Curated annotation (Swiss-Prot):
One of its GO terms (cellular component) is histone deacetylase complex. Component of the RPD3C(L) complex composed of at least ASH1, CTI6, DEP1, PHO23, RPD3, RXT2, RXT3, SAP30, SDS3, SIN3, UME1 and UME6. Component of the RPD3C(L) histone deacetylase complex (HDAC) responsible for the deacetylation of lysine residues on the N-terminal part of the core histones (H2A, H2B, H3 and H4). Histone deacetylation gives a tag for epigenetic repression and plays an important role in transcriptional regulation, cell cycle progression and developmental events. This is Transcriptional regulatory protein SAP30. It comes from Saccharomyces cerevisiae (strain ATCC 204508 / S288c). GO terms for molecular function: transcription coregulator activity; transcription corepressor activity. Present with 704 molecules/cell in log phase SD medium. Residues 25-59 have a biased composition (Low complexity). Keywords: Chromatin regulator, Nucleus, Repressor, Transcription, Transcription regulation.
Length: 201
């Protein structure tokens, strides 16, 4: 009879280790779960630390970038300001110093020649750019250079000499207001209009 009791004891002893083992396995699983949660927490902490580090690193660089953009904008504004003052503002015709109306040397060659031809002044034309170029050794061999010598009647003169002749004639010329003012008004009103002639049959 002791044998069956022993068998029960063995079965109980066998059952106890299995239960204990079962408990042990459950305990090990819970430990593993706890370790996994701890690892997850550590990973989350590491991610938070990395994000904090990235934020800390991005802070100065972003501000540095904004400061760089501001400095670039200021430099561009200064460049544009200098460009306007140098190349745009100074080239405006209203800002240029206007010459005196009686300074005939400032007038163009075409105007002086038209004035001479209109009033039929006994004075030759002034030298052009080609005439000045004839002053070289190569230009001295041309016909135009020989024509401009002192012995010829149609020699060219300098622009300054022609301007002096035109100024003296203008000072000595008597102006009639009854003839000058109507012509001036007519020219101002019709300076940009083209002459049109209509034929009606």
């Amino acid at each position: 009879m002791a044998r069956p009791v022993n068998t029960n004891a063995e079965t109980e002893s066998r059952g106890r280790p299995t239960q204990g083992g079962g408990y042990a396995s459950n305990n090990n699983g819970s430990c593993n779960n706890n370790n996994g949660s701890n690892n997850n927490n550590n990973n989350n902490n590491n991610n938070n630390n990395n994000s904090n580090n990235s934020n800390n690193n991005n802070g100065p660089t972003s501000s540095g970038r904004t400061n760089g953009k501001q400095r670039l904008t200021a430099a561009q504004q200064q460049y544009i300001k200098n460009l306007i003052e140098t190349h745009i503002t100074d080239n405006h015709p209203d800002l240029r110093p206007k010459s005196h109306p009686m300074d005939f040397e400032e007038y163009t060659d075409a105007f002086l020649r038209r004035y001479k031809d209109h009033f039929q002044l006994d004075v030759p034309d002034n030298l052009t750019l080609q005439g000045y170029l004839l002053g070289s050794k190569l230009g001295a061999k041309t016909y135009s250079y020989k024509r401009n010598t002192q012995g010829q009647h149609d020699k060219r003169i300098h622009k300054r000499d022609l301007a002096n002749v035109v100024r003296r004639h203008f000072d000595e010329h008597s102006i009639k207001e009854t003839d000058c003012i109507p012509q001036f008004i007519y020219k101002v009103k019709n300076q940009k209009k083209k002459f049109k002639m209509e034929f009606r049959g």
